[in-house]
């Protein structure tokens, strides 16, 4: 065997592009959350054994997989098997999620409690711990913020209030992400998910769309699911 190749090892699928998978070795030891463009990290470009298709095994972002025929020079490998999943979120399709941060804005667009409840139900139904994040809290009074917190507390959920304008609550949400293995940001369009990701990882520079003045809601900009390391 070539010294540039090794036997089997495991890794986590961080992105899917056409018929290829990007797998990060030992990624299970890092912290991740999802977004929609490449960070150009050192990853292995992988194909998959046809037997997985015959067995009806579908691989999604977040899946832990076994690799073989690894070429470290060219950074390629073959996915030979899929490890058991601990959880699965259907939309976006992400496996092994341990925390879903559900972002809802208190203004621009106005908080929609019914919409928030649908995201919470999805998280609970997927056996994933939900974290409710209230964004743009600089646009409302402290009294209104406490009203929303009390309302969601009656539902059984504590809230984190976040404002990128005055940096309020940012460290708290970072601590939540670092305490778990794989986190997902979810929520309606226009609530500030992309802005939050750009703040946490400035090198990404993800495109941001403004809230429609006519429709009073955000414009959907997500293209695909990808995992990124939050770092230290």
Predicted segments, located by residue:
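Conserved C-terminal guanine-recognition region of P-loop GTPase G domains, centered on the G4
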Residues: 78, 88-160
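Switch I (effector-binding) loop of TRAFAC-class P-loop GTPase G-domains
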Residues: 51, 86, 203-232
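Signal for well-folded cores of large energy- and translation-related assemblies
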Residues: 14, 121-124, 138, 150-153, ...
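N-terminal accessory targeting/assembly segments
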Residues: 1-113
């Amino acid at each position: 065997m070539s010294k540039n190749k090794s036997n089997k090892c495991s890794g986590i699928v961080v992105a899917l592009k056409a018929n290829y998978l990007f797998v990060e070795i030992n990624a299970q030891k890092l912290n991740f959350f999802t977004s929609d463009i490449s960070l150009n990290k050192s990853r292995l470009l992988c194909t998959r054994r046809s037997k997985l298709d015959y067995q009806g095994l579908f691989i999604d972002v977040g899946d832990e997989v076994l690799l073989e025929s690894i070429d470290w020079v060219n950074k390629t490998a073959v996915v030979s098997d899929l490890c058991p999943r601990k959880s699965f979120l259907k939309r976006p399709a992400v496996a092994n999620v341990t925390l879903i941060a559900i972002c809802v804005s208190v203004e621009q667009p106005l908080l929609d409690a019914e919409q928030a409840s649908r995201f919470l139900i999805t998280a609970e139904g997927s056996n994933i711990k939900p974290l409710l994040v209230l964004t743009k809290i600089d646009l409302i009074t402290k009294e209104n913020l406490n009203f929303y917190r009390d309302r969601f507390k009656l539902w059984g959920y504590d809230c984190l209030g976040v404002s990128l304008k005055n940096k309020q609550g940012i460290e708290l949400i970072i601590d939540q992400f670092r305490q778990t293995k794989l986190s997902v940001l979810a929520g309606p369009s226009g609530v500030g998910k992309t802005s939050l990701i750009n703040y946490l990882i400035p090198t990404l520079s993800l495109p941001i769309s403004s809230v429609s003045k006519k429709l009073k809601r955000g414009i959907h900009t997500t293209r695909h699911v990808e995992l990124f390391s939050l770092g230290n």
